[in-house]
């Protein structure tokens, strides 16, 4: 659809061709002419990878953008965007423009720096040399303005590669792009400068994860979503989005210097759109061109405008001072007036170097159909769409509906036994469930501080044949909970949807199918302000539940804590017109305050209510009975309650819909209408004459109507689903699933999957989970995966929000609480000392780490914590208690390493950039003052349990088969002031053994109860892994500080060093007691390996050496003879049979596994990022469950406390193998060894 006015054609063609005709001798922009960048300039460096987002870059002054003047931080992404707010992970790749966040996009494409060759640098620069150069660029593009910036954000994408995707386009192999964006700001305005060196853009398209093909890069700006509650797209401007225009970025300009593009992005002139510079390349000031005599043929020159509707927009000649302004009138197409956002495929593009400006104003979008625009300004519009019929639209109807064609289109209608609008149908009389989210920003009483809550769950249950709805909204703060009690209509809308229908009248679901938008305004009489309620119903989801999103904003009167609210039955008139329903009423409610001095004062209050409901109605069926213009909703048995302990708000109402009546709604009405029929909850009530009625079981149930039973269609009709299927019965219905290796065809039958290899989207990164810092992608087999938010975040896994742990006031009153992504910290206020959970008057003495940190920063003149650390300078990190953080990293090089409690580097722990070593803290957290925690063991009940360590305690998690009984998890043992690392279990004496790296020591405790005991506390460095030989009655452990492996009897006596050479960071250790083998891991960064030997130390050899990263945990399953390990470097779990050393990958894509144990078909491992115990099913190679303890700290060792020992014996099982001291089993024999500290007169060594 092109505007063909000859005048517009001539002007635009001339504007697009001028840069070609007038190109002068201006030279190309070289890489050396970019703004200085790199570590030497103090730049920060974005993490290598795909789809990464930087932390917030705090700005010294505000950035202005469109109509905003308060942007104090920006975010830099891998994909060529500078964002004015943190981008959601699902929008971090191309294909979603305009995004919901504010964006400056000099080259929006799917870029990749995983190989480490490409880099993204960014900084804010206040130096005069940089700000002056930015000012010169702006003056060149806008010579008439006076602009002197005080700061500049400089972002450089250097040698970044295109994301290739599975297709691996050979044309893009080895190609890399370099470009730069500078955002310069003064007190009154901001400008963007884009720089593209002549050889900087070697590719112009990238593979789209969303579209599965190559898409062009985009040069654009977007205001992002606007509005607090009801979001809508703000203004946005696109300057290049096809291959030809992107190719010419380095060849042309709008500022007079080739490869340099300047835009005014924040000032009073940019409220509705970004203003580009318009200095034509190669022209001289004062040049004039005749606009009247030239004409061009559009057959050879094509316009570069997208067919997207806006309000009338003036296109000026692309030179300052142009006299002619050409306005394209906009014609609104009624058929598409409610489109959510500007739509329409791009028209053919211009071949000119000049980029056409496309502006999209913040407004309700309009899509415009324009056929011809003549010189007279008359616009002719037409609709070329053919009539829609059931033949190609049957899928728009419910499976329980029929589709019928009419003269102007098609309509859907539910079949007998179902109710709805045809697009959505549910069984008559069947209970319904509604799920959704609630967010709000509410001022209570006269408070000037709003109560804000987000992502709050709403659940509703509806007994349809009674018209009664029960709605619960969880985690509502008590500061606002009681004050929301009068707002029963928040849940009342659900009651209207499923109100009992009287003959000839329809409830909300019959009219809308549960797909509509509702906005209501509540005005409280005698109180200032009002409350706006916005709700969007999105129909039935894949689980058969209706979905709703609710947003509340405004002010409500304060209701005292502990009050009750009573609402009398009421009626409300609903007025209907095409696709719109309105109602208004005045309601009273009684507030009874808590009893004081023997009296409970009550007062009656009033509010006025207005609401509008909009929905999509099928208008093609002229024969359908007209809906009454007015219907009366009768509501009684209104119940409202706020549970202060559970923080749950509850509403319950009974609803019926019918004609306008005066007096009691119950008078002389049929029991079906007033809910006194007594039918089963899975039955429909059929009214008869006067007060007669019958009960009829809903479809999928059978019975007499007063009692209904579910029909098991799968048992009664074994072939109902067809071949290669599994039938699953559900209440009132059934579902069919294809067996493994089959998938549903378009005809609904299961057909074999042909030549389709499953894709692990978690491994390839093509999933839609939130960023790894907030969520994890869990591979579930085949091509399936699930998304789960990490601890400290909430959401559906695709979008995770930080949980504000400071909200419940967890810190001491004399401490500050700092909420951080996924966690929080407490810090005592000045003049107090403590850990933040307990603060007492006094100044705390600084630790060695804090002194060293202050000394280094002071010597470098970098004492301002808001400024970045100077490049090349290493500054140690201290933990919350002032001790050296166990993991230290160099900010410039990216290398990380472990340190001991004195800050000294631990040999063999240094990792390359992008990998973090699994360092252990050697300092226990301080003990909080308060009631003493008993250290006695809490006896375990019978059965098999998982035992895992969490800093200063050991917890138990019962197993039922392979299922974790998470609700029964409890503490087994508290050992304050210790950091327990390794765990092992003796199935004979039912004793658990552990290593502690703080004292250091090795201890044990009985599962039957009693006090724990320390069995070894001398000559230890950093004991980590520990293993038990339950047949030989020995323990083995690794020591990563002394670099050795030792053995001793179970009581800690008779110690002997087995190995003290060729060990760097030994950690996990396990025994194969029956065969007399020992296995251990060494995560030496230079040479990670898994080794084995006999238990006597002979026959030592490397078992696994290739393709290891950070092998942490190790487990041996005596029942299957399988050795498995978890690797925090490769993020894999792997297994092998030591007698047949062919490895197999159990699962990839783990987060940060630490320790592992086995039981049955499962591995169970602790994960540092998830702070969870994760179950991995080896049979299907996927994570099946996860347990997250209430206390969110790191989990360490894990072991299985078996209810009985595995069968088998070795040569040390009986009479200690005839040895005087240590009996150490070997395959088919044993070796008698003496302890290191025993002279030979009473000890005999023999084989």
Curated annotation (Swiss-Prot):
PTM comment: N- and O-glycosylated.
Assigned keywords, A-Z: Basement membrane, Calcium, Cell adhesion, Disulfide bond, EGF-like domain, Extracellular matrix, Glycoprotein, Repeat, Secreted, Signal, Sulfation
CDD domains in alphabetical order: EGF_CA, nidG2, TY
Domain Nidogen G2 beta-barrel intervals: 430-667
Localization annotation: Secreted, Extracellular space, Extracellular matrix, Basement membrane
Principal location listed in the UniProt entry: secreted
Modified residues (Sulfotyrosine): 289, 296
Disulfide bonds: 390-403, 397-412, 411-618, 414-425, 672-685, 679-695, 697-708, 714-727, 721-736, 738-750, 762-777, 769-787, 789-800, 806-817, 811-826, 828-839, 849-878, 889-896, 898-919, 1212-1223, 1219-1232, 1234-1243
Annotated ranges, domain Thyroglobulin type-1: 846-919
Transmembrane segments: none
Record Gene3D superfamilies: Green fluorescent protein, Laminin, Thyroglobulin type-1, TolB, C-terminal domain
GO molecular function, one term: proteoglycan binding
GO biological process entries: basement membrane organization; cell-matrix adhesion; glomerular basement membrane development; positive regulation of cell adhesion; positive regulation of cell-substrate adhesion; positive regulation of integrin-mediated signaling pathway; positive regulation of muscle cell differentiation; regulation of basement membrane organization
Protein name (database record): Nidogen-1
């Amino acid at each position: 659809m092109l505007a063909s006015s000859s005048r517009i054609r001539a002007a635009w063609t001339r504007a697009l061709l001028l840069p070609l005709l007038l190109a002068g001798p201006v030279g190309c922009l070289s890489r050396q002419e970019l703004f200085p960048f790199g570590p030497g300039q103090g730049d920060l460096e974005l993490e290598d990878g795909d789809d990464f987002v930087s932390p917030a870059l705090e700005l010294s002054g505000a950035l202005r953008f469109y109509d905003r003047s308060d942007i104090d931080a920006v975010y830099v992404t891998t994909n060529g965007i500078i964002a004015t707010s943190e981008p959601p992970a699902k929008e971090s790749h191309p294909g979603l423009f305009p995004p919901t966040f504010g964006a400056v996009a000099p080259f929006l494409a799917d870029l990749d720096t995983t190989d480490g060759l490409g880099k993204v640098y960014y900084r804010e620069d206040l130096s005069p040399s940089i700000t002056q150069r930015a000012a010169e660029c702006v003056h060149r593009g806008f010579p008439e303005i006076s602009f002197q910036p005080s700061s500049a954000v400089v972002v450089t994408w250097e040698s970044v590669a295109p994301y290739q995707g599975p297709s691996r386009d050979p044309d893009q192999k080895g190609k890399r792009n370099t470009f730069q964006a500078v955002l310069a700001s003064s007190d009154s305005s901001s400008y963007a400068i884009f720089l593209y060196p002549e050889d900087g853009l070697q590719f112009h398209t990238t593979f789209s994860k969303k579209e599965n093909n190559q898409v062009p890069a985009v040069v654009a700006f977007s205001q992002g979503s606007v509005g607090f509650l009801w979001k809508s797209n703000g203004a946005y401007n696109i300057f290049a989005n096809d291959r030809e225009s992107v190719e010419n970025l380095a060849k042309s300009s709008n500022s007079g210097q080739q490869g340099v593009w300047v835009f005014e992005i924040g000032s009073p002139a940019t409220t509705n759109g970004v203003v580009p510079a318009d200095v034509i390349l190669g022209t001289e000031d004062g040049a004039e061109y005749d606009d009247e005599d030239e004409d061009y043929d559009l057959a050879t020159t094509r316009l570069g405008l997208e067919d997207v509707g806006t309000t009338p927009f003036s296109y000026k000649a692309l030179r300052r001072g142009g006299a002619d302004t050409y306005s394209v009138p906009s014609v609104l197409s009624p058929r598409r007036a409610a489109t959510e956002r500007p739509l329409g495929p791009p028209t053919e593009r211009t071949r000119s170097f000049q980029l056409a400006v496309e502006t999209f104003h913040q407004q309700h979008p309009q899509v415009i159909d324009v056929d011809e625009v003549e010189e007279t300004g008359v616009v002719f519009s037409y609709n070329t769409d053919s009539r829609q019929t059931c033949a190609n639209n049957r899928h728009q109807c419910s499976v329980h509906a029929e589709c019928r064609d009419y003269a102007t289109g098609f309509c859907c209608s539910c079949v007998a036994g179902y109710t709805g609008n045809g697009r959505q149908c549910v069984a008559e009389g069947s209970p319904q469930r509604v799920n959704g989210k609630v967010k709000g920003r509410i001022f209570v009483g006269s408070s000037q501080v709003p109560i804000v809550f987000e992502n709050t769950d709403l659940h509703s249950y509806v007994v349809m044949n009674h018209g009664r709805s029960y709605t619960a909204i969880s985690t509502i703060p008590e500061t606002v909970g009681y004050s929301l009690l009068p707002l029963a209509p928040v849940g009342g809308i659900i009651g209207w949807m499923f109100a009992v229908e009287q003959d000839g009248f329809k409830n909300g679901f019959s009219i809308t199918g549960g797909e509509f938008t509702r906005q209501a305004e509540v005005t409280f009489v005698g109180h200032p302000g009002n409350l706006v309620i916005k709700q969007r119903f999105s129909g039935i989801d894949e689980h058969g539940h209706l979905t709703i999103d609710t947003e509340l904003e405004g002010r409500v009167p304060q209701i005292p804590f502990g009050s009750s609210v009573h609402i009398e039955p009421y009626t409300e008139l609903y007025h209907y017109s095409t696709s719109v329903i309105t109602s208004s009423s005045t309601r009273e409610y009684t507030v009874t305050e808590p009893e004081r001095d023997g009296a409970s004062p009550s007062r009656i209050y009033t509010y006025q209510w207005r609401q509008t409901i909009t929905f999509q109605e099928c208008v093609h069926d002229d024969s359908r009975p007209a809906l009454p213009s007015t219907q009366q909703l009768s509501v009684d048995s209104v119940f409202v309650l706020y549970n202060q302990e559970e923080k749950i708000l509850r509403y319950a109402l009974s609803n019926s819909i019918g004609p306008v009546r005066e007096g009691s709604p119950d008078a002389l009405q049929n029991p079906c209408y007033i809910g006194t029929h007594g039918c089963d909850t899975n039955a429909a009530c059929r009214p008869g004459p006067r007060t007669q009625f019958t009960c009829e079981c809903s479809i999928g149930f059978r019975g007499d109507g007063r009692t209904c039973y579910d029909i098991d269609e799968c048992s009664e009709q074994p072939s109902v689903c067809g071949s290669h299927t599994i039938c699953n019965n559900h209440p009132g219905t059934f579902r069919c699933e294809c067996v493994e290796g089959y998938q549903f065809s378009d005809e609904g039958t299961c057909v074999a999957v042909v030549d389709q290899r499953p894709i692990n989207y978690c491994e390839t990164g093509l999933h839609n989970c939130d960023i790894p810092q907030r969520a994890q992608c869990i591979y579930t087999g085949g091509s399936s995966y699930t998304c789960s938010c990490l601890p400290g975040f909430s959401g559906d896994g695709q979008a995770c929000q930080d949980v504000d742990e400071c909200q419940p006031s967890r810190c001491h009153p004399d401490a500050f609480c700092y909420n951080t992504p996924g966690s929080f910290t407490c810090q005592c206020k000045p003049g107090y000392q403590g850990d933040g959970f307990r603060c007492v008057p006094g100044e705390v003495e600084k630790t060695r780490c804090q002194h060293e940190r202050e000394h280094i920063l002071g010597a470098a003149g970098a004492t301002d914590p808001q400024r970045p650390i100077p490049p090349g300078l290493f500054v140690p990190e201290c933990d919350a208690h002032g001790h050296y953080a166990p993991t230290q990293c160099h900010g410039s090089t990216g290398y990380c390493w472990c340190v001991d409690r004195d800050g000294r580097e631990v040999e063999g722990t240094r990792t390359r950039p992008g990998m973090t070593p699994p360092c252990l803290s050697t300092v226990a957290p301080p003990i909080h003052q308060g009631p003493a925690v008993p250290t006695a063991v809490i006896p375990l009940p019978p059965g098999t349990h998982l035992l895992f360590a969490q800093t200063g305690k050991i917890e138990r998690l019962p197993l039922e088969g392979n299922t974790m009984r998470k609700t029964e998890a409890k503490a087994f043992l508290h050992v304050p002031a210790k950091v327990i690392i390794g765990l092992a279990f003796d199935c004979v004496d039912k004793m658990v053994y552990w290593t502690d790296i703080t004292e250091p020591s090795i201890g044990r405790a009985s599962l039957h109860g009693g006090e724990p005991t320390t069995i070894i506390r001398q000559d230890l460095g950093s004991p980590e892994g520990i293993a038990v030989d339950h047949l030989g009655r020995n323990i083995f452990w690794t020591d990563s500080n002394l670099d050795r492996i030792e053995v001793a009897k179970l009581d800690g006596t008779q110690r002997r060093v087995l190995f003290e050479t060729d060990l760097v960071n030994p950690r996990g250790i396990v025994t194969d007691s029956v065969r007399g083998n020992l296995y251990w891991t060494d995560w030496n960064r230079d040479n990670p390996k898994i080794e084995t030997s006999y238990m006597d130390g002979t026959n030592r050899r490397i078992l696994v050496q290739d393709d290891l990263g950070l092998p942490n945990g190790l487990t041996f399953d005596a029942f299957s003879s399988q050795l498995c390990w978890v690797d925090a470097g490769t993020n894999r779990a792997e297994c092998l049979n030591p007698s047949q050393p062919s490895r197999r990958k159990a699962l990839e894509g783990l987060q940060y596994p630490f320790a592992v144990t086995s039981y049955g078909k499962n591995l169970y491992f602790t994960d540092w990022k998830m702070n969870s115990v994760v179950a991995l099913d080896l049979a299907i190679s996927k994570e099946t469950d996860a347990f997250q303890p209430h206390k969110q700290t790191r989990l360490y060792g894990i072991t299985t406390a078996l209810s009985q020992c595995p069968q088998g014996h070795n040569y040390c099982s009986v009479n200690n193998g005839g040895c005087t001291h240590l009996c150490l089993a070997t395959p088919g024999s044993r070796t008698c060894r003496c302890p290191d500290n025993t002279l030979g007169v009473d000890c005999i060594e023999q084989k």
